[in-house]
Every structure is written in C-alpha cells, then in structure tokens.
C-alpha cells in the first residue's frame, strides 16, 4: 500500500478500496456470488505483521513494566486499548495458538495509554473488511530511525508462524 507512514488515507493506501476490490474479484473469479464473498470474509482471519517496539535499554520507562518485548525472544502480539492495533482477546488467542503450533516463542506488547502510539494497517483492514485481525511483529530497537535494529531469530520465528497460519495447522 502507499502512504502507510502518513496514515494510509488515499486511493492507493490501506484506507482505500484496493484490498477490498481485489478480494472480491478473486472470490467472483472462483465462482462466488456477493453473499458468498461476504460469508468468506466473516469466516476469515487476518494477521497484520508490522514490527513492534522492543524495550530500549536507554528508555525502559516507555514500556509497561509487565510488557517489555525483547529482541530475539520471539514475535510480539501487539495491543492498544485505543485500537491503534487491531488485536482483540479473540485474535490474541488465535495468535497464541499459531505461535504454539509452530513451536515459536512469543511476547506481548501493550502500549502505554498515557503515551502516543503509532498504528498499523491492521485496524484499517479490520474496519474495511470486517475481518478479525491480530497485530503482531518482530521486536526492534529504534523504529523509524536511520539505524533500526532487530534480532536474527525473530524474523525466522515469525516466518515459521506465518507458514503454520497459512497452512492451517493450528
């Protein structure tokens, strides 16, 4: 999608109709009518995968004490009470099942509600399509800086979890 770093509200951004139209065209091309397409959406789930903020050793106070994702300790399930992430209790449980089925360690990132928080396209996708969505990500240091840093194991673990999710073995 275009314009992800500035809000996604454009024709080519996640807030536009592109994903919705592509999915409907795929459904119609496989013989589904509109009612079947809508039923398929209702029965679907989505993983929004965008990196997560790892606790920075210079700024540990910026994380909730019980929710401090660390590099190379597994992907993080991301939660925000203002819905800046799409994760719900139901979709967090889905992600946990997927991680456990894949044999992948996982962590939880809960953004502090007294500090600003960025967002992902997860809430946009969930809102536009009505699909249960979970936001997950590889913990990284210095997000949006010239020197972002993540571990070597976390991307491999996330790839293994995505393979398990897409294979339906959870």
What function would you assign to each model-found segment?
Residues 1-67, 169-170:
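Acidic/histidine-rich catalytic neighborhood of metal-dependent amide-processing enzymes
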Residues 8-16, 81, 85, 111, ...:
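Hydrophobic alpha-helical scaffolding
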Residues 19-22, 67-71, 128-131, 148, ...:
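Short, surface-exposed linear patches
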Residues 24, 28-31, 97-105, 141, ...:
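Generic secondary-structure signature for well-ordered alpha-helical cores
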Residues 54-140, 144-145:
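Active-site-adjacent substrate-binding region
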């Amino acid at each position: 999608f275009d314009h992800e770093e500035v809000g996604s509200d454009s024709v080519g951004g996640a807030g536009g109709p592109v994903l919705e139209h592509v999915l409907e065209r795929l459904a119609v091309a496989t013989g589904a009518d509109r009612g079947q397409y809508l039923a398929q959406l209702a029965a679907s789930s989505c993983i929004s995968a965008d990196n997560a903020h790892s606790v920075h050793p210079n700024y540990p106070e910026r994380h909730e004490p019980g929710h401090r994702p660390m590099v190379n300790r597994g992907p993080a399930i991301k939660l925000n009470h203002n819905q800046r992430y799409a994760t719900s209790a139901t979709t967090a449980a889905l992600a946990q099942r997927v991680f456990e089925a894949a044999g992948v360690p996982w962590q939880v990132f809960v953004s502090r509600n007294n500090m600003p928080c960025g967002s992902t396209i997860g809430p946009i996708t969930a809102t536009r399509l009505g699909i249960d969505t979970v936001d997950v990500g590889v913990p990284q240091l210095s997000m949006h800086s010239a020197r972002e840093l993540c571990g070597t194991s976390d991307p491999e673990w996330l790839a293994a979890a995505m393979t398990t999710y897409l294979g339906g073995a959870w």
